[in-house]
């Protein structure tokens, strides 16, 4: 056959402790990237296809402050996160499309920016007056036609102008997931969650001491639950 794709490895790019780098207009196919301790990193006009598969590692980021992902596409990623960013203050994802991801149920594999603070825990960060985890932004995001959950944005994050449509996952997850930590000091606005029959449109957890999160101008249609407020 003349139409054969051979995959020889899972991760073809590791970058550590290297800052002020910009990748623009690059197609990453059949492999994933890993960033550690790389500050002020920008991905712009890039496409990530077939980044992960069964038993292979997906795209991941940790300890990389002020990372920006703009005008990018993540597609055909199976059994892994198309994008997972942890312990990295001030990430920005803007005008990003996630489509045709995952084949299996019960795994979620939502695009994620979580634990966006420095230090061992959010409680310790607050006690030390650490403001570094204020700045997560998800703006102009589309997630569609996938067997995944939606956005897991983390604490003190902003989600706005997001459209999530035709998500077929059925686990205990949501189009926009604001669990106890992720709801705290968050803002979710001007977003649409459409036709996710196995998911909550939005999950928003509260607590006796309150979460201080804002949720407004959100449309939820054709989902298992429109808004799950706990």
Residue ranges and their predicted role:
Residues 5-22, 30-40, 53-61, 80, ...:
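Extracellular beta-strand-rich solenoid/capping regions of secreted or surface-exposed proteins
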Residues 19-27, 39-52, 63-78, 88-115, ...:
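Right-handed parallel beta-helix
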Residues 108, 175-180:
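Long, charge-dense partner-interaction scaffolds in eukaryotic RNA-expression machinery
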Residues 170-172:
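A flexible loop/linker signature enriched in serine peptidases of the S9 family
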Residues 208:
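Active-site-proximal loop/turn and secondary-structure-junction residues that shape catalytic pockets
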């Amino acid at each position: 056959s003349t139409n054969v794709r051979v995959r020889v490895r899972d991760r073809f790019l590791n970058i550590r402790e290297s800052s002020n780098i910009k990748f623009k207009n690059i197609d990453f196919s059949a492999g994933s990237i890993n960033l550690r301790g790389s500050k002020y990193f920008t991905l712009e006009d890039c496409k990530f296809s077939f980044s992960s598969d069964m038993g292979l590692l997906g795209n991941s980021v940790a300890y990389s402050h002020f990372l920006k992902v703009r005008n990018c596409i993540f597609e055909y990623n199976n059994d892994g996160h198309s994008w997972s960013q942890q312990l990295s203050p001030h990430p920005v994802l803007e005008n990003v499309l996630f489509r045709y991801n995952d084949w299996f149920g019960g795994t979620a594999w939502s695009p994620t920016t979580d634990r966006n603070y420095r230090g061992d825990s959010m409680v310790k960060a607050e006690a030390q007056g650490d403001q570094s985890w204020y700045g997560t932004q998800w703006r102009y995001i589309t997630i569609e036609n996938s067997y995944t959950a939606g956005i897991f944005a983390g604490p003190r994050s902003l989600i706005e102008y997001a459209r999530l449509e035709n998500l077929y996952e059925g686990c205990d997850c949501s189009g926009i997931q604001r669990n106890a930590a992720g709801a705290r000091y968050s803002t979710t606005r001007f977003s649409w969650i459409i036709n996710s029959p196995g998911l909550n449109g939005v999950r928003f957890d509260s607590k006796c001491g309150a979460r201080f999160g804002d949720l407004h101008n959100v449309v939820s249609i054709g989902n298992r639950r429109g808004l799950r407020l706990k």
